[in-house]
């Protein structure tokens, strides 16, 4: 009897400990950082000069981290390139790099800074996490020596990686991620030999890590959610906004909803390069977001999130659209270009209506009602089903309702930032050939519409009430990863030409060297 009671007592005690040591909610912080850039140079600076630049940025990050901790935050995410900027060649970034060990070494740099050589940046980040009892996510550069025994070893005898690091609330290094999908112009870094799947567990859920351009590809982004069941993504980024479908807050919030996870996106603040847009996004709606092209200051965001995301019901993205007939119309289809992709469009000529437009295997259906039909603004329903080939190769299926740049239909698909037309109702669906579809709603002045729309299990994106502001776009952004035929960047700098970049008309997202 005593033994039986003791076992029951122990079992109850264990359950209590588990309950006490986990949290149902947590407070997340992201910091949009106005990075201090070093002077452009064709020759490497000294380690001391590089550290001086990095410490200027770390001073600003310290203020944000301390403020977040004082407001109760459990974790803070800071941007890609936030400690030294992006204007580098392979040689000139070298003084800014540190050797970042595998987290399995069980290391608190704040307590033992010389264990892995000279690591002042890791030491300072570790101390900021430890002194403020907060998880800190940051982006720095890693260097790894290699030799002739490695057939892929670069000629300069080292690999250089765009790297995210995570320090826990004790200052311990708990995660290291080498960015896999480098964006054009990141010639200063190597591509890891295979995608790294990086997670870390906390008392407020399981987290996954990836960086900027990674979000457009299956590995590691989708794998982290589908196979490793993370609750929250931490996402350092240097994202350049591209309308109509790839502004930062628009696409990142859509990815959170489409994948059913929390998403903590920290962007650089550099309006002259269209870099702004950070947010804390839950699966059902944005919790906090920031988009500011007018000022030069950074911004700290905080919000409470559920620790363990309950993945929403599975959406059959083609169920509704494939079960209805195409809406008849007398309007003439026309083509227009959105970020180099040729869409098939139909103009919305009435204040209310139903339209269908198709391209290849994708048919998009729209029902809508405007508050009024203005003569100075034109809206169109568009479809794109094809391989995007500019600044990356990725297969897209997109259904979009968008405002055209002018009152002439030939401008449909161009970037638009303001609108005057409000919509009382919309319902958008498509015959998608993928389960990976990301729902976007973007209002005038590049603002989100939290709580004003939702997705049904049969694949409709629809409004729940009249929108609170004039509409820029309503979009279902689909990805068919297996059709990508992605051209991987070489991990061997012998195939790279330092300082030479592919030039295109419009720079898109992530970490450019100019």
From Swiss-Prot:
The keyword Signal applies. Keywords: Cell membrane, Glycoprotein, GPI-anchor, Hydrolase, Lipoprotein, Membrane, Signal. It is an enzyme of class 3 (hydrolase). A lipid is attached at residue 492 (GPI-anchor amidated aspartate). GO terms for biological process: pantothenate metabolic process. It is found in: Cell membrane. GO terms for molecular function: pantetheine hydrolase activity. Residues 1-22 form the signal peptide. The keyword Transcription does not apply. Residues 493-514 form a propeptide. One of its GO terms (cellular component) is plasma membrane. Glycans are attached at residues 39, 87, 147, 316, 354. It comes from the Eukaryota. Its main location: membrane. Its EC number is 3.5.1.92. It catalyses: (R)-pantetheine + H2O = cysteamine + (R)-pantothenate. Residues 40-307 form the CN hydrolase domain. The active site is at 80 (proton acceptor), 179 (proton donor), 212 (nucleophile). It is a lipid-anchor; GPI-anchor. Amidohydrolase that hydrolyzes specifically one of the carboamide linkages in D-pantetheine thus recycling pantothenic acid (vitamin B5) and releasing cysteamine. Monomer. Belongs to the carbon-nitrogen hydrolase superfamily. BTD/VNN family. This is Pantetheinase. It comes from Canis lupus familiaris. The gene is VNN1.
């Amino acid at each position: 009897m005593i033994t039986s009671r003791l076992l029951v007592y122990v079992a109850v005690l264990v359950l209590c400990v588990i309950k006490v040591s986990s949290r149902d909610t947590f407070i997340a912080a992201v910091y949009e950082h106005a990075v201090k850039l070093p002077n452009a140079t064709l020759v490497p600076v000294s380690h001391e000069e590089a550290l001086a630049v990095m410490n200027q940025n770390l001073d600003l990050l310290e203020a944000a981290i301390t403020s977040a901790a004082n407001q109760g935050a459990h974790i803070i995410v800071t941007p890609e390139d936030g400690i030294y900027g992006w204007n580098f060649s392979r040689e000139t970034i070298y003084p800014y790099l540190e050797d970042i060990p595998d987290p399995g070494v069980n290391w608190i740099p704040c307590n033992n800074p010389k264990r892995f050589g000279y690591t002042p940046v890791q030491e300072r980040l570790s101390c900021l996490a430890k002194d403020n009892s907060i998880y800190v996510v940051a982006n720095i550069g890693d260097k790894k020596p290699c030799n002739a025994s490695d057939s892929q070893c670069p000629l300069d005898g080292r690999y250089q990686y765009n790297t995210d690091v995570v320090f826990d609330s004790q200052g311990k290094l708990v995660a290291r991620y080498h960015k896999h999908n480098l964006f054009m112009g990141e010639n200063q870094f190597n591509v890891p030999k295979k995608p790294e799947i990086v997670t870390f567990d906390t008392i407020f859920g399981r987290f996954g890590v990836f960086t900027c351009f990674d979000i457009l590809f299956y590995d590691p982004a989708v794998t982290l959610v589908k196979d490793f069941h993370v609750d929250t993504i931490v996402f350092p980024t240097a994202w350049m906004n591209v309308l109509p479908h790839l502004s930062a807050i628009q696409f990142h919030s859509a990815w959170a909803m489409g994948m059913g996870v929390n998403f903590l996106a920290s962007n650089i603040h550099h309006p002259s390069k269209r870099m702004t847009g950070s947010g804390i996004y839950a699966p059902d709606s944005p919790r906090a977001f920031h988009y500011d092209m007018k000022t030069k200051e950074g911004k700290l965001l905080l919000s409470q999130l559920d620790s363990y995301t309950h993945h929403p019901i599975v959406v059959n993205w083609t169920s509704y659209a494939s079960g209805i007939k195409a809406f008849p119309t007398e309007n003439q289809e026309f083509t227009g270009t959105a970020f180099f992709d040729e869409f098939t469009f139909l103009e919305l000529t009435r204040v209310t209506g139903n339209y269908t437009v198709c391209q290849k295997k994708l048919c998009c259906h729209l029902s809508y009602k405007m508050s009024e039909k203005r003569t100075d603004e034109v809206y169109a329903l568009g479809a794109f089903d094809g391989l995007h080939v500019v600044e990356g190769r990725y297969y897209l299926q997109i259904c979009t309702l968008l405002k055209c740049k002018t009152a002439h239909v030939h401008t449909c698909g161009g970037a638009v930032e303001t609108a005057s037309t409000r919509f009382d109702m919309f319902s958008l669906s498509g015959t998608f050939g993928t389960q990976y579809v990301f729902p976007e709603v973007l209002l005038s002045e590049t603002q989100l519409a939290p709580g004003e729309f939702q997705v049904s299990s049969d694949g409709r994106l629809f409004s729940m009430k009249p929108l609170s502001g004039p509409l820029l776009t309503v979009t279902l952004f689909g990805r068919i990863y297996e059709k990508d035929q992605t051209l991987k960047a070489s991990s061997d700098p012998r195939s790279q030409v330092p300082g030479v970049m592919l030039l295109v008309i419009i720079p898109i997202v992530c970490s450019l060297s100019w």
